[in-house]
């Protein structure tokens, strides 16, 4: 059933079109009160032309967005050391900084960029004056145990921003023990009524850079969802006059229609192992949740009642689904065990709760919570039931969690149009990614790539 998109639905093949370097502009809307101070010193550049990317700026922005770190502004840095031997440890500890990144960039004869960088424990360096010694083969040698890592990489200009995100991931993991999610992407739908193809599915780096158009249509596109390997997107298209579910290979442009049952086909979501899709169909009347085996095409009905059941999301262990249902009168979030069909209600605080997702560690439920203040993102501890409202934006919807569980991207209203917003999982850091050429909806954060 594989075929190329026709007429009104165009896939941009092999070399996907670069829409803009940063069509989504990230704007910080709320700072961090108690995040860990860190110094990301501007890298020394030993060249004649400007660097293609300011590596230290990308790294500092990444770490700030995590909500866990507060990079020292360059204007407040007491010095700009380019390697660990130049660090004045007392000057940095007086600022409350316990960790510092320093580095330099040179260019080799091939035109490639050689990046040397070090992450330094400033407090340890202060204690030892950077001159600690350790016994090695019966000899006392300089250990430099204040250097947490010392790395060298050779890259080309087009990969420089990508590698800056890689450095951010390394720092994040070194200091938190958790994997960083800065080398990831987001997919989203842009709607521009003035465009010949007003509905566009785009993919960008998580921070909005390197945006690329992968699909465009004259009819609505909805609900993009990543496969676990990051190579495919499931989505809903109205190209043929009704909602149908497709899957698209974002590298080859191949797409395949998966379901076209009467009435509604929607809300696709890949299982953690990538072998199944959870979907919503209304072929028997009300909205019901099914799973579709992607190899055998076997369809299994999960919910069976007269209420509307939608927005399925897989528990990380793949053994249950959470979903939104109006079986109690108003939308609330429930959990169904796939082995025996037993169902339990998860949400009780707020008049409505919908759009639920579970963090990768299984600890928290992220959802859209309706209260007297409107529709806002909230986090519920699945063990204690405690609920924390994370946002104060307007008409929040479609939350999507980073693969490490540290951030959430979602759609909200700003300046009377849909934009993408971002909030750290603890609610301390908030940012907005407004599009310059349309309304942006239905974000989906990729898996680790």
Curated annotation (Swiss-Prot):
It comes from Vibrio vulnificus (strain YJ016). Gene3D superfamilies: TolB, C-terminal domain, TolB, N-terminal domain. SUPFAM superfamilies: TolB, N-terminal domain, Tricorn protease N-terminal domain. It comes from the Bacteria. Disulfide bonds: none annotated. The gene is tolB. GO terms for cellular component: periplasmic space. The keyword Cell cycle applies. Belongs to the TolB family. Part of the Tol-Pal system, which plays a role in outer membrane invagination during cell division and is important for maintaining outer membrane integrity. PANTHER family: PROTEIN TOLB, PROTEIN TOLB HOMOLOG. Keywords: Cell cycle, Cell division, Periplasm, Signal. This is Tol-Pal system protein TolB. It is found in: Periplasm. Its main location: periplasm. InterPro entries: 6-blade_b-propeller_TolB-like (IPR011042), PD40 (IPR011659), Tol-Pal_TolB (IPR014167), TolB_N (IPR007195). Residues 1-22 form the signal peptide. One of its GO terms (biological process) is protein import.
């Amino acid at each position: 059933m594989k075929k190329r998109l026709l007429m009104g639905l165009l896939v941009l093949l092999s070399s996907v079109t670069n829409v803009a370097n940063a069509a989504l502009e990230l704007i910080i809307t709320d700072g961090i009160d108690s995040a860990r101070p860190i110094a990301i010193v501007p890298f020394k550049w030993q060249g004649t032309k400007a660097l293609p990317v300011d590596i230290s700026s990308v790294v500092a922005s990444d770490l700030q967005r995590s909500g866990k770190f507060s990079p020292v502004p360059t204007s407040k840095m007491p010095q700009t050391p380019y390697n660990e031997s130049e660090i004045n440890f007392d000057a940095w500890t007086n600022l409350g900084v316990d960790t510092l990144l320093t580095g330099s960039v040179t260019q080799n004869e091939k035109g490639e960029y050689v990046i040397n960088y070090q992450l330094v424990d400033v407090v340890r360096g202060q204690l030892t004056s950077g001159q600690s010694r350790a016994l090695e083969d019966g000899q006392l040698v300089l250990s430099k145990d204040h250097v947490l890592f010392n790395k060298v990489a050779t890259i080309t200009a087009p990969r420089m921003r990508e590698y800056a995100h890689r450095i951010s991931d390394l720092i994040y993991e070194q200091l938190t023990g958790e994997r960083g999610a800065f080398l990831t992407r987001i997919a989203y739908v842009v709607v521009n009524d003035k465009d010949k193809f007003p509905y566009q599915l785009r993919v960008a780096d998580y921070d909005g850079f390197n945006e690329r158009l992968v699909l465009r249509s004259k009819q609505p596109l909805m609900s993009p969802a990543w496969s676990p390997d990051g190579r495919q997107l499931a989505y809903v298209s109205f190209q043929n006059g009704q909602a149908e579910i497709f899957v698209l290979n974002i590298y080859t442009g191949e797409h395949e229609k998966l379901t076209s049952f009467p009435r509604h086909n929607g809300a696709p979501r890949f299982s953690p192992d990538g072998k199944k899709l959870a979907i919503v169909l209304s072929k028997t009347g009300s909205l019901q949740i099914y799973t579709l085996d992607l190899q055998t095409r076997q369809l299994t009905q999960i919910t069976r009642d007269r209420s509307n059941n939608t927005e399925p999301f897989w528990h990380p262990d793949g053994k249950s689904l959470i979903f939104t249902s109006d079986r109690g009168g108003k939308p609330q979030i429930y959990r169904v065990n796939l082995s025996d069909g037993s169902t339990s209600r998860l949400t009780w605080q707020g008049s409505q709760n919908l759009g639920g997702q579970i963090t990768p560690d299984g600890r928290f439920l992220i959802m859209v919570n309706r209260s007297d203040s409107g529709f806002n993102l909230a986090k519920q501890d699945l063990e204690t039931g405690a609920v924390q409202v994370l946002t104060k934006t307007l008409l929040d919807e479609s939350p999507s969690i980073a693969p490490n569980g540290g951030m959430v991207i979602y759609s909200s209203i700003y300046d009377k149009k849909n934009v993408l917003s971002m909030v750290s999982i603890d609610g301390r850091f908030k940012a907005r990614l407004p599009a310059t050429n349309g309304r942006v909806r239905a974000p989906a954060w990729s898996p680790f790539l």
